[in-house]
Amino acid sequence: MPNAIGIDLGTTYSCVGVFQHGKVEIIANDQGNRTTPSYVAFTDSERLIGDGAKNQVAMNPTNTVFDAKRLIGRRFDDPSVQSDMKHWPFEVTQVGGKLKICVEYKGEKKMFSAEEISSMVLTKMKEVAESYLGRTVSDAVITVPAYFNDSQRQATKDAGAIAGLNVLRIINEPTAAAIAYGLDKKVGGERNVLIFDLGGGTFDVSILTIEDGIFEVKSTAGDTHLGGEDFDNRMVDHFVKEFQKKYNKDIRSNKRALRRLRTACERAKRTLSSSAQTNLEIDSLCDGTDFYTVITRARFEELNADLFRGTLDPVEKALRDAKMDKSQIHDIVLVGGSTRIPKVQKLLQDFFNGKELNKSINPDEAVAYGAAVQAAILSGEKCEAVQDLLLLDVAPLSLGLETAGGVMTALIKRNTTIPTKQTQTFTTYSDNQPGVLIQVFEGERALTKDNNLLGKFELSGIPPAPRGTPQIEVTFDIDANGILNVSAVDKGTGKQNKITITNDKGRLSKEEIERMVADADKYKAEDEKQRDRVSAKNSLESYVYTMKQQVEGELKEKIPESDRQVIISKCEDTISWLDVHQSAEKHEYESKREELEKVCAPIITKVYQAGGMPGGMHEASGAGGGSGKGPTIEEVD
């Protein structure tokens, strides 16, 4: 069975791992980084994903998309989307009630759903794994915040399908991190472990009991909209005000300036985890004005005081739900890059009366590590280190339906172990009622209007009868991905209807997913074509400059002057052509190279046969991938 991979699809960074040779390997990307920015950029000539996209963001802010995880499975009118839009340089809009991200790609306006952007990041992670493993990969386990609701999980699964992945399972990030911790620690007797997972955009707290390879989640709580990005936002707002006060200039409307400031703030935040203060130095931030300033750790903590303190609320809630006292927690495990912030650690440690926090696992890689283990288990890995592991996860929110008077009647209570199936019998509210409308909600409030509507369906054809007579049996069934199926059957007639919750019209239809898969293949082919084009251009450039240097340098005395001038003149023509044709097609570069070789090769061969060739020249003429021998030297602009 080919290895399945585990992908941590993060708000700001993603990470991929694979279980092989009895252990998990976290895979580095082509830049040598073990985490990859969850960024996708669109330019006049190409699409960039990962480091390449993040590195050019200041030059191309409106067409560089990030934070797709803060959009996925949400509606346009969601308050969190509306507040985030103030901070994003790219445009978010709605088309036919569906949320879309607008960019300009190759000179044309394009619209993408959050699932499509996430699928591009997943494709990148898939390619990272494939180039490491040396073969195609199709099976994957993808992680989501434990507090993600049904629509967000379903949308993440769809993103996997668009990326050409067979999603074996969607698992919760803190649970994945607990696997990494449990395997690493070889936990023996029963231990209560609290996972505190504060990442770039989401926050989860889960309490698990780990004993002899059984990971049982007791409770989970969190905020799907709190993380490092929010701390950056506070700093950005602070400096925008400072800049306005100092120079009387508002940089809010200048997207490039705002992006450069955000990048500097992100860097400053990281520095403040190890230093008491740091400088921000941004040359020519706005209208030629330089911005040099200082921020102390104390000021950073003050700007985020409410957010930092707020991380303790889900900790208290998780303890209450697990019916545990804080003294019963054996280990507090930190996961996610934002747990490096000293103030966050101090608040948590103080809450647990000075108990030591566990920092033994890598906060950036633990989730992908656990996902890779779960992927190995699901694809039948027989290694004894993992085969006896059992994961018992829970539903993060209560699920139920609306009954008379808009009351929420929960069939599955939050923190119920999944997979689970619950059935309850309902009846009609009025005499001779011909049908019932089954409206499915998730949430903890008593009235459905305060909860989230997941979907609805009609069970019709109920024979006329007095109210309270018909018996309608409703079944809620949550699968191991945390995704819900609801069915209803009229016991009298045997009529039934069912629904896989498809998130009030926000969910992609089967046809849309198929179209997006086709689009993804098309973009991938375009990316490859662009890579081939650049490679052909580099090969021609490398050949022409090598040739020119050789005949003007070490071969100068060995070639007849007339031949030398022929080569120089042809090289200069080619260089002039290259200056004008920066975006020619692959075949044009190749035919130019052939033309050049036709002129140069016979002259060089004559010198070579006469024994005048310096060592290695013959090889060098093929630098840039032309000769097929030795490594390709790629020039970097």
From Swiss-Prot:
It comes from Schistosoma mansoni. Major immunogen in Schistosoma mansoni infections. Possibly plays an important role in parasite development and pathogenesis. Belongs to the heat shock protein 70 family. SUPFAM superfamilies: Actin-like ATPase domain, Heat shock protein 70kD (HSP70), C-terminal subdomain, Heat shock protein 70kD (HSP70), peptide-binding domain. Coiled coil: none annotated. The keyword Cell division does not apply. The keyword Transmembrane does not apply. This is Heat shock 70 kDa protein homolog. It comes from the Eukaryota. Residues 615-637 are annotated as: Disordered.
